Amino acid sequence: ELSSKSHHSSLHKKAGFDWECYHRLYKFIKKGGYEVVHAHVGSIPYILLSAMLLRKVKFVATIHSEARREAGRNIMKWSRFIMFQHHKCTPVTISDESKVSFDEYYKMDAPMVYNGVPQYSAKCMAPLVDNNDQLLFIHPASCQKVKNQELLIKAFAKLVKDYPNVKMLWLGSNETFKSLYDTLVPDMVSQFKYVGTVPNVRDYLAQADAMCLSSKMEGMPMTIIEAFSVGCPALCTPVGGILNMIEDGKNGMLSASLSVEDYYLMLKRFCKLPSEQKKQMRLQAKESFAKYSIDNTAKGYLEVYK
Protein backbone atom coordinates (compact mmCIF):
# COMPACT_ATOMS: atom_id res chain seq x y z
CA GLU A 1 0.00 0.00 0.00
CA LEU A 2 1.26 3.46 -0.91
CA SER A 3 1.60 6.19 1.67
CA SER A 4 -0.45 9.32 1.03
CA LYS A 5 2.91 11.04 0.56
CA SER A 6 3.82 8.69 -2.30
CA HIS A 7 2.61 8.96 -5.88
CA HIS A 8 2.56 6.38 -8.64
CA SER A 9 3.20 7.31 -12.28
CA SER A 10 3.56 5.10 -15.36
CA LEU A 11 5.90 5.73 -18.29
CA HIS A 12 3.88 3.21 -20.35
CA LYS A 13 6.93 1.13 -21.13
CA LYS A 14 6.52 -1.33 -23.99
CA ALA A 15 7.28 -5.03 -23.60
CA GLY A 16 10.97 -5.79 -24.00
CA PHE A 17 13.60 -3.05 -24.21
CA ASP A 18 11.98 0.33 -24.90
CA TRP A 19 14.36 2.98 -26.27
CA GLU A 20 11.72 5.70 -25.93
CA CYS A 21 11.77 5.25 -22.15
CA TYR A 22 15.14 7.04 -22.01
CA HIS A 23 13.60 10.29 -23.23
CA ARG A 24 10.30 9.88 -21.38
CA LEU A 25 12.11 9.28 -18.10
CA TYR A 26 14.46 12.22 -18.70
CA LYS A 27 11.51 14.57 -19.26
CA PHE A 28 9.68 13.16 -16.23
CA ILE A 29 12.65 13.69 -13.90
CA LYS A 30 13.45 17.15 -15.26
CA LYS A 31 9.84 18.32 -14.99
CA GLY A 32 9.51 16.93 -11.45
CA GLY A 33 12.56 18.79 -10.19
CA TYR A 34 13.67 15.81 -8.10
CA GLU A 35 16.83 15.96 -6.00
CA VAL A 36 17.30 12.18 -5.79
CA VAL A 37 16.35 9.42 -8.24
CA HIS A 38 16.60 5.85 -6.94
CA ALA A 39 16.48 2.98 -9.47
CA HIS A 40 16.09 -0.77 -8.98
CA VAL A 41 16.59 -3.86 -11.15
CA GLY A 42 15.29 -3.41 -14.72
CA SER A 43 14.88 0.35 -14.45
CA ILE A 44 18.62 0.97 -13.92
CA PRO A 45 19.71 1.20 -17.60
CA TYR A 46 16.88 3.63 -18.37
CA ILE A 47 18.34 6.32 -16.11
CA LEU A 48 21.56 6.50 -18.20
CA LEU A 49 20.54 9.54 -20.30
CA SER A 50 19.17 11.37 -17.26
CA ALA A 51 22.26 10.61 -15.17
CA MET A 52 24.53 11.99 -17.91
CA LEU A 53 22.55 15.20 -18.48
CA LEU A 54 20.96 16.12 -15.12
CA ARG A 55 24.07 16.87 -13.10
CA LYS A 56 22.26 18.45 -10.14
CA VAL A 57 20.27 15.26 -9.50
CA LYS A 58 21.67 12.49 -7.28
CA PHE A 59 21.18 9.09 -8.94
CA VAL A 60 21.25 5.89 -6.86
CA ALA A 61 20.84 2.25 -7.93
CA THR A 62 20.34 -0.71 -5.59
CA ILE A 63 21.98 -3.97 -6.68
CA HIS A 64 19.73 -6.75 -5.38
CA SER A 65 21.69 -9.86 -6.36
CA GLU A 66 25.07 -11.18 -7.52
CA ALA A 67 26.64 -8.36 -9.56
CA ARG A 68 27.56 -10.24 -12.74
CA ARG A 69 24.15 -11.87 -13.12
CA GLU A 70 22.32 -8.69 -12.17
CA ALA A 71 24.21 -6.70 -14.82
CA GLY A 72 22.96 -8.85 -17.66
CA ARG A 73 24.37 -8.35 -21.16
CA ASN A 74 24.77 -5.72 -23.86
CA ILE A 75 23.17 -2.37 -23.01
CA MET A 76 22.00 -3.62 -19.61
CA LYS A 77 25.63 -4.31 -18.74
CA TRP A 78 27.55 -1.40 -20.27
CA SER A 79 25.06 1.24 -19.09
CA ARG A 80 25.81 0.17 -15.52
CA PHE A 81 29.56 0.29 -16.08
CA ILE A 82 29.34 3.79 -17.57
CA MET A 83 27.22 5.20 -14.75
CA PHE A 84 29.03 3.52 -11.87
CA GLN A 85 32.63 3.94 -13.00
CA HIS A 86 32.12 7.54 -14.15
CA HIS A 87 30.38 8.39 -10.86
CA LYS A 88 27.10 9.35 -12.52
CA CYS A 89 25.15 6.99 -10.29
CA THR A 90 25.89 5.65 -6.80
CA PRO A 91 25.50 1.85 -6.56
CA VAL A 92 24.26 0.37 -3.26
CA THR A 93 24.62 -3.30 -2.30
CA ILE A 94 22.33 -5.07 0.16
CA SER A 95 24.42 -7.81 1.79
CA ASP A 96 28.02 -8.79 2.50
CA GLU A 97 27.81 -11.35 -0.29
CA SER A 98 26.42 -8.89 -2.85
CA LYS A 99 29.01 -6.27 -1.89
CA VAL A 100 31.90 -8.69 -2.44
CA SER A 101 30.53 -9.68 -5.86
CA PHE A 102 30.00 -6.02 -6.80
CA ASP A 103 33.46 -4.85 -5.72
CA GLU A 104 35.10 -7.71 -7.63
CA TYR A 105 33.03 -7.31 -10.80
CA TYR A 106 33.13 -3.52 -11.15
CA LYS A 107 36.57 -3.08 -9.53
CA MET A 108 35.23 -0.40 -7.22
CA ASP A 109 33.86 0.01 -3.71
CA ALA A 110 30.13 0.35 -3.10
CA PRO A 111 28.23 1.25 0.08
CA MET A 112 26.00 -1.39 1.66
CA VAL A 113 22.54 -0.87 3.14
CA TYR A 114 20.58 -3.84 4.45
CA ASN A 115 16.99 -4.26 3.31
CA GLY A 116 14.41 -3.68 6.02
CA VAL A 117 10.74 -3.98 6.93
CA PRO A 118 8.59 -2.26 9.60
CA GLN A 119 7.77 -3.89 12.92
CA TYR A 120 4.93 -6.41 12.68
CA SER A 121 1.54 -5.70 14.22
CA ALA A 122 -0.16 -8.98 15.13
CA LYS A 123 -3.57 -9.62 13.59
CA CYS A 124 -6.32 -12.06 14.50
CA MET A 125 -6.44 -14.85 11.92
CA ALA A 126 -7.98 -18.31 11.82
CA PRO A 127 -5.54 -21.18 12.54
CA LEU A 128 -3.77 -22.47 9.43
CA VAL A 129 -2.94 -25.92 10.83
CA ASP A 130 -5.33 -28.86 10.70
CA ASN A 131 -4.42 -30.05 14.21
CA ASN A 132 -2.31 -28.88 17.14
CA ASP A 133 0.55 -31.28 16.42
CA GLN A 134 0.95 -30.38 12.75
CA LEU A 135 4.14 -28.60 11.60
CA LEU A 136 3.40 -25.68 9.29
CA PHE A 137 5.81 -24.44 6.61
CA ILE A 138 5.35 -21.37 4.42
CA HIS A 139 6.91 -20.89 0.97
CA PRO A 140 6.55 -17.18 0.09
CA ALA A 141 7.62 -16.77 -3.54
CA SER A 142 6.15 -16.29 -6.99
CA CYS A 143 6.40 -19.19 -9.42
CA GLN A 144 9.57 -18.80 -11.49
CA LYS A 145 12.58 -20.93 -12.39
CA VAL A 146 15.03 -19.03 -10.21
CA LYS A 147 12.87 -19.77 -7.14
CA ASN A 148 13.37 -23.48 -7.88
CA GLN A 149 10.00 -24.73 -6.66
CA GLU A 150 10.62 -28.09 -8.30
CA LEU A 151 13.31 -28.82 -5.70
CA LEU A 152 11.06 -27.78 -2.80
CA ILE A 153 8.08 -29.80 -4.00
CA LYS A 154 10.11 -32.98 -4.52
CA ALA A 155 11.97 -32.62 -1.22
CA PHE A 156 8.71 -32.07 0.65
CA ALA A 157 7.18 -35.13 -1.03
CA LYS A 158 10.03 -37.19 0.47
CA LEU A 159 9.55 -35.55 3.87
CA VAL A 160 5.86 -36.49 4.20
CA LYS A 161 6.79 -40.17 3.98
CA ASP A 162 8.67 -39.71 7.27
CA TYR A 163 6.48 -36.98 8.77
CA PRO A 164 2.95 -37.14 7.32
CA ASN A 165 1.57 -34.56 9.79
CA VAL A 166 3.17 -31.57 8.07
CA LYS A 167 1.75 -28.87 5.82
CA MET A 168 3.30 -26.50 3.27
CA LEU A 169 1.48 -23.37 2.06
CA TRP A 170 2.78 -21.75 -1.13
CA LEU A 171 2.08 -18.01 -1.17
CA GLY A 172 2.74 -16.12 -4.40
CA SER A 173 1.60 -15.54 -7.96
CA ASN A 174 1.68 -18.27 -10.61
CA GLU A 175 0.26 -16.13 -13.42
CA THR A 176 3.47 -14.98 -15.15
CA PHE A 177 4.84 -18.51 -15.54
CA LYS A 178 1.60 -20.50 -15.62
CA SER A 179 3.10 -23.16 -17.91
CA LEU A 180 5.90 -23.75 -15.39
CA TYR A 181 3.37 -24.01 -12.56
CA ASP A 182 1.37 -26.59 -14.53
CA THR A 183 4.45 -28.83 -14.79
CA LEU A 184 4.90 -28.69 -10.99
CA VAL A 185 1.35 -29.62 -9.97
CA PRO A 186 1.66 -33.40 -10.56
CA ASP A 187 4.48 -33.64 -7.98
CA MET A 188 2.59 -31.77 -5.23
CA VAL A 189 1.49 -34.08 -2.43
CA SER A 190 -1.82 -33.40 -0.68
CA GLN A 191 -0.02 -31.66 2.20
CA PHE A 192 1.49 -29.12 -0.25
CA LYS A 193 -1.12 -26.42 -0.86
CA TYR A 194 -0.95 -23.57 -3.38
CA VAL A 195 -2.67 -20.51 -1.86
CA GLY A 196 -1.69 -17.75 -4.29
CA THR A 197 -1.08 -14.10 -3.48
CA VAL A 198 -2.14 -12.82 -0.06
CA PRO A 199 -2.40 -9.23 1.30
CA ASN A 200 0.10 -9.72 4.13
CA VAL A 201 2.52 -12.64 4.07
CA ARG A 202 3.58 -11.95 7.66
CA ASP A 203 0.15 -12.93 8.98
CA TYR A 204 0.91 -16.42 7.64
CA LEU A 205 4.56 -16.46 8.70
CA ALA A 206 3.51 -15.56 12.24
CA GLN A 207 1.74 -18.93 12.51
CA ALA A 208 4.42 -20.98 10.76
CA ASP A 209 7.01 -23.23 12.35
CA ALA A 210 9.40 -22.21 9.56
CA MET A 211 9.52 -20.61 6.13
CA CYS A 212 11.18 -22.27 3.14
CA LEU A 213 13.13 -20.92 0.16
CA SER A 214 14.70 -23.22 -2.43
CA SER A 215 16.13 -20.54 -4.73
CA LYS A 216 18.99 -20.92 -7.19
CA MET A 217 19.95 -17.28 -6.69
CA GLU A 218 19.05 -14.56 -4.16
CA GLY A 219 20.24 -11.15 -3.01
CA MET A 220 18.86 -10.44 0.44
CA PRO A 221 15.30 -11.84 0.38
CA MET A 222 12.71 -9.55 1.93
CA THR A 223 10.72 -12.68 2.79
CA ILE A 224 13.45 -13.84 5.19
CA ILE A 225 13.47 -10.42 6.85
CA GLU A 226 9.68 -10.59 7.12
CA ALA A 227 9.99 -14.06 8.65
CA PHE A 228 12.54 -12.85 11.20
CA SER A 229 10.26 -9.94 12.13
CA VAL A 230 7.66 -12.42 13.41
CA GLY A 231 10.17 -14.90 14.87
CA CYS A 232 9.87 -17.45 12.07
CA PRO A 233 13.05 -19.45 11.27
CA ALA A 234 14.12 -19.73 7.62
CA LEU A 235 15.05 -23.03 5.93
CA CYS A 236 16.91 -22.21 2.72
CA THR A 237 19.35 -23.19 0.02
CA PRO A 238 22.88 -21.76 0.51
CA VAL A 239 22.87 -19.03 -2.15
CA GLY A 240 23.68 -15.31 -2.37
CA GLY A 241 23.01 -13.05 0.58
CA ILE A 242 21.15 -15.83 2.40
CA LEU A 243 24.55 -17.03 3.59
CA ASN A 244 24.97 -13.75 5.48
CA MET A 245 21.50 -13.92 7.03
CA ILE A 246 21.14 -17.47 8.34
CA GLU A 247 23.27 -19.11 11.00
CA ASP A 248 22.58 -22.80 10.58
CA GLY A 249 20.87 -24.24 13.63
CA LYS A 250 20.31 -20.84 15.24
CA ASN A 251 17.87 -18.61 13.32
CA GLY A 252 17.24 -21.15 10.59
CA MET A 253 18.92 -23.88 8.56
CA LEU A 254 20.83 -24.19 5.29
CA SER A 255 20.81 -27.21 3.01
CA ALA A 256 24.22 -28.66 2.12
CA SER A 257 23.59 -28.06 -1.59
CA LEU A 258 20.86 -27.39 -4.14
CA SER A 259 19.97 -31.06 -4.51
CA VAL A 260 16.57 -32.52 -3.62
CA GLU A 261 18.23 -34.98 -1.24
CA ASP A 262 20.09 -32.30 0.72
CA TYR A 263 17.04 -30.07 0.99
CA TYR A 264 14.99 -33.04 2.20
CA LEU A 265 17.65 -33.86 4.81
CA MET A 266 17.54 -30.28 6.07
CA LEU A 267 13.73 -30.39 6.40
CA LYS A 268 14.02 -33.72 8.21
CA ARG A 269 16.68 -32.27 10.52
CA PHE A 270 14.29 -29.46 11.45
CA CYS A 271 11.37 -31.82 12.05
CA LYS A 272 13.50 -33.95 14.39
CA LEU A 273 14.33 -31.01 16.66
CA PRO A 274 12.74 -31.14 20.13
CA SER A 275 10.03 -28.51 20.65
CA GLU A 276 12.30 -26.58 23.03
CA GLN A 277 14.95 -26.22 20.33
CA LYS A 278 12.35 -25.08 17.80
CA LYS A 279 11.21 -22.47 20.34
CA GLN A 280 14.79 -21.29 20.83
CA MET A 281 15.24 -21.02 17.07
CA ARG A 282 12.16 -18.79 16.90
CA LEU A 283 13.62 -16.51 19.57
CA GLN A 284 16.91 -16.24 17.70
CA ALA A 285 15.10 -15.53 14.44
CA LYS A 286 13.30 -12.66 16.17
CA GLU A 287 16.59 -11.35 17.55
CA SER A 288 18.08 -11.45 14.03
CA PHE A 289 15.49 -8.93 12.88
CA ALA A 290 17.12 -6.06 14.80
CA LYS A 291 19.58 -5.09 12.06
CA TYR A 292 16.92 -5.38 9.34
CA SER A 293 14.49 -2.81 10.74
CA ILE A 294 13.18 -0.26 8.25
CA ASP A 295 14.55 2.53 10.46
CA ASN A 296 18.11 1.31 9.90
CA THR A 297 17.46 1.00 6.16
CA ALA A 298 16.13 4.56 6.02
CA LYS A 299 19.14 5.92 7.92
CA GLY A 300 21.49 4.07 5.58
CA TYR A 301 19.90 5.49 2.44
CA LEU A 302 19.71 9.01 3.85
CA GLU A 303 23.50 8.85 4.21
CA VAL A 304 23.81 7.70 0.58
CA TYR A 305 21.49 10.48 -0.62
CA LYS A 306 23.69 13.24 0.86
PLM region spans:
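Conserved acidic donor-binding segment of nucleotide-sugar-dependent glycosyltransferases
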Residues: 248-249, 253-260, 269-275
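Short His-centered aromatic/hydrophobic patch
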Residues: 39-46, 63
